[in-house]
Amino acid sequence: MLSAIIDYKERLLAAKRFVIVACGTSWHAALIGKHLIESFCRIPVEVEYASEFRYRDPVIHEDDVVIAISQSGETADTLAAIELAKEKGAFIYGICNAVGSSIPRITDTGSYIHVGPEIGVASTKAFTGQVTVLTMLALTLAKEKGSMTDEKYLEVIRELTAVSYTHLRAHETSQDL
């Protein structure tokens, strides 16, 4: 997950702006990503519905990073948004669950969330995986950029660890009921 961020950190840190394109549940994960990247990295972020992005003439520059998020890696609107952003010279970072799908093949780099198949309409595993990747992206870039102190970085990591333990305890308690 982090290798794509570390391998392309110079390009990611050089971004004047991030634009996140997604649909459905992935769009909701993108809203959290916007908050994290802006708060931790101090880089402006726009979140766009891929279905709207593709039908207008978005202002995209070569120093923009476009993050494309899709559980399936085959969302037609997100694929079209990627192609449009590539034509305008943006660097494309994909976040996807499906290994070998179209989105990872056409982006410059990216991360898989590896959460397995989603059963049902509510895409809870994919949402959690997407937010996790966006969190790691924001934390890694903030640390590299120096926009977050080491103390704050460690505090956030400790808080995230505590969330995992709290979830596990709640799960164990619910199993006992």
Give the predicted meaning of each segment.
Residues 176:
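Cationic, low-complexity basic patches in intrinsically disordered or flexible, solvent-exposed regions
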Residues 166-173:
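Conserved small/polar residues in nucleotide/adenosyl-binding loops
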Residues 13-162:
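Glycine-rich phosphate-binding loops that contact phosphosugars or nucleotide phosphates
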Residues 1-16:
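An N-terminal, well-structured beta->alpha segment
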